[in-house]
Amino acid sequence: MKTTLTRTFIRRTAILGAFAFACVAANAQTANVQIIPAAKQLNAGEGKFDIGLDTRIALADSQSAEDRFAAQDFIDDVKQTAGVTVRLGGNSARREILIGRIDLPRIQQALKRAAVDSGRQLSDEGYVLSVGLHEVVVAGKTAIGTFYGLQTLKQLVRGEAANAFIPGMKIVDWPTMRWRAVSDDISRGPVPTVDYIKRQIRTEAFFKLNMHSFYMEHTFASGSHPLIGPAGGSLAPDEIRELVAYARRYHVELVPEQQTFGHLHKALRLEKYAELAETPYGDVLSPQQPGSYKLIADWYKELNELFPGQFFHIGEDETFELGEGQSKDEAKAKGVGAVYFEHLNRVRDVLKPYNRRLMFWGDIALHHPDLIGNVPKDMIVMNWQYGAVDDYTKYIKPFKDAGLDQFVCPGAHNWNQIFPNIEAASKNIANFVRDGQQAGALGMMNTTWDDDGESLFESAWYPITLGAAASWQEGTLDLQKFDRDFDWAFFRADGDQFVKVTHALGGIPVLLNAGTTDELFWRDPFTTQFQNQTRNMAERTSGMRLLAEQALEMLIQNDKVARRNRATLSAMRLAAQRYDHLGRRMEVMKKFSDQYWDAYLNLGDRAKVRKLRYYTGAIYNNLREMAEELSILKEAYRQQWLAENRPYWLESILARYDGMIRMWLNQSRGMDEALRKYETSSTLPNPEEFGLGTRPTATPTTAPR
């Protein structure tokens, strides 16, 4: 399949004459409709459809298990979020929600009553939605389209309990991109529970995403290679079967990404597999070893039995060690690029019996543009680029020119951050997906990564949802409209308080301009580098704390406002608390340095020295407060982790908290001891013993006596 097929798909689904009504963008009622993704064509009508005890859902095809599931899913949602009980089937009702395939006679009759011309063909995922005073019709070309129409209908329900209603309107909608995916890193720390993966599937399907990929280095519980998958931290076959069946009901294809070249250190560090490593106990499989291909064949034989579907994702990115070890001579003779592409083709040959389309990351291929022609045309390039730039054409064009299908793969920018960098993620996703659509890309895969092992997926729903909108809608995503719609679509909350908090927390990495915020959070404060940075960032630190505290206050006050996805608010609260503590830590270190140096240079002023300990708010107390705050944060982080993930790997993160707690307590004990000795010796330890570094320039210059 080539990109021309994707363009055909887009042309076929973009028939503007599918219905006799036109999109009226200027209509005030239309402008007030808040749904994500936004519909291609929407015409707001008059009146409303009241939802009550006399409302029934009717299946145009009573034998359709898929439609029955979609109907029950809608019933469960409106009961939970709007407090409305809607029944499925039963006697004829005064108000009816009719669902089914668009070609069924009963659907055709209902659309005729609603004056909707359904004579043109939709794509398989497209749907028609008509809301009248007494009848709602949700019809898809297939059961998938009907399901997506009901996801839109969920967002259209307004009011609660006896006052619940759906505003009158007509919608025709279809996706711009065939595949709309999320990749979740489950190999470098967090490994989600089965229940949480189900939450991911449900939420992604709600926003019309149709693919979820597991990024795996060593976290597949392989029966043929049981040493590799960690106990308690791997996806087991029974779990995969359960998840595949669950995802099928939500029309989400689960795609395994088992690395087949780089990123395999967790396997290659084992002595049993050491001979397969390009460099000793390294990261890259050696293409010189036949056993490398035996390992790949064994893994994918099992994965083929567990994951039905069209795709395997074989990874193949960041093979930094290639040509430095066992393949050094071959790389010297042929070039590293040639060795890479030979391996890529050999993996394809190993997996050919499974008749899957193979996805692979495109970064190495872009480094060898002259060799891109060696990529078989049936493979799919997963073209990842995370820079927030205005134009991605130069990254897309080489693969398009080679006649290769590709996914554009932006990122949620959650890696190494306390909360995702929303500014970078928004620009990356919106522009990359736009340019991918223009080039006829087969799909979009939005990526989340756990590079430092502590990222929490629950914090990343804004960029994930934004990717869903960008890939379903056509052209440049209107970010302002997306933000206007976000609180209602995601939280079922009026207003924009939650999206404002999202931008406040997501803007802190830009405000600080200090690299990754996780790294800053764990940086040793008792170093000259940290203290100099703290002084340079004093104004920004204050701004960060105000943003974090305002966000936290709003989240506390509005906790009950959200009727959907309230779990996300807990992750946002944790991020706000961590940012506030980080700012507090910076302020404490500045105060500690200033006051201790002042006391050290004025040892004869006993009142000044004693202020370090003997009054409320003294630095001695501040040091202990840091440990106390970290203890509270540690517990909050533990709870948030376990709400998403298995216990596996958690202790390695909590150990970071423990280490920093001990550091602050040790400093407070050292300060206590130093001040006690001062009473008899009139001396204090050199500030360097407390890690205070060079003397602050504003500190009085009186020499110590």
Model-derived segments and their meaning:
Residues 66-68, 221-224, 264-266, 322-324, ...:
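Extracytoplasmic/secreted cell-surface and envelope-processing proteins
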Residues 102-104, 260-261, 318-321, 364-367:
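Short, internal active-site loops enriched in acidic
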Residues 12-24:
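Bacterial N-terminal signal peptides
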Residues 77, 115-352, 359, 408-410, ...:
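Feature activates predominantly on carbohydrate-active enzymes
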Residues 35-38, 43-44, 122, 129, ...:
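Substrate-binding groove of N-acetylhexosamine-processing glycoside hydrolases
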Residues 29-177, 431:
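Contiguous, structured surface segment used for ligand recognition
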Residues 2-15:
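Bacterial N-terminal signal peptides that target proteins for export
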